[in-house]
Amino acid sequence: FLSHSNFGSSKDASALKVRRARDLFRALAPDVECDGEMHGDSALSAKLRAATMPDSTLSGEANLLVCPNLDAANILFNVLKTVAGSGVTIGPMLLGAAAPAHVLTPSSTVRRLVNMTALAVDEAQVRRRTGK
């Protein structure tokens, strides 16, 4: 769970929102490893996180980055997509509504379109099967 605050270093409303989101996630999915609120570099570097927050429950590098708002998520997605070069990206996805929304941007490749379509079809099948 990403923030400008690092493990309680700020009492700002945004940092508190991220902490509440992390707590809610932990309550709903106690078996899923997560931690935060933390800086992006702490999320991606186990070595840095161990130095700054030795009690962190996250092992290794984060493989999912939860952002505090849509602006931050969009900026991060586009920066990582560019920095990663020709790596495969799946996303962005907007969660929290009655159903997930998959967003395709003008820079979407055919591969991303196929990946997002496959993901949406799988989610639709799961929703139909489970009634959720």
Question: Where in this protein do the model-derived segments appear?
Answer:
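Glycine-rich phosphate/diphosphate-binding loop of Rossmann-like nucleotide-binding domains
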Residues: 1-37, 41
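Glycine-rich phosphate/nucleotide-binding loop
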Residues: 24-132
